[in-house]
Amino acid sequence: MPAHLDAIDWKILKEMQDDGRITNVELARRVGISAPPCLRRVRALEEAGFIKGYRAVLDEKLLGYEVTVFAMVHLTSQAEPDLKAFEDFVRKEPLVRECWMLSGEIDFVLKCVAPDLKTFQAFVAELTGAPHVRNVKTSLTLRNSKDEAIVPLPAK
């Protein structure tokens, strides 16, 4: 798949992002091509990495995760092995939903969920004791005004 996407590819990406459960037949109808070439295009988009995967979006509150917290982490070292060690630690933590390395004063920001504050406090104690962690500052969320797991696509 070339890096250049044509208008049909963009339509496929938009439709699939809007509804990941769409059938190939319906997708083909919406983008204006027949089913076999539509499926070939979807496979090519997957192989090229434009489509990274498929999953259900779950409601964490209904599943008992009442607390969402952002943790700002400062490390004692920014040497690449130390950064990788911290990232490896975070990948193993089920309460961490996202981990972003930043430029500036904060090295990493983590988006975490927990069933309650006591569970999150226990995680913070573990996080603070992780290798190369200088300090951790947290901010408890009050509400979420926007949560879209989509990529803005240009109108084609």
Where are the model-predicted features located?
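A compositional/biophysical signature of low hydrophobicity enriched in polar/charged and small residues
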Residues: 1-156
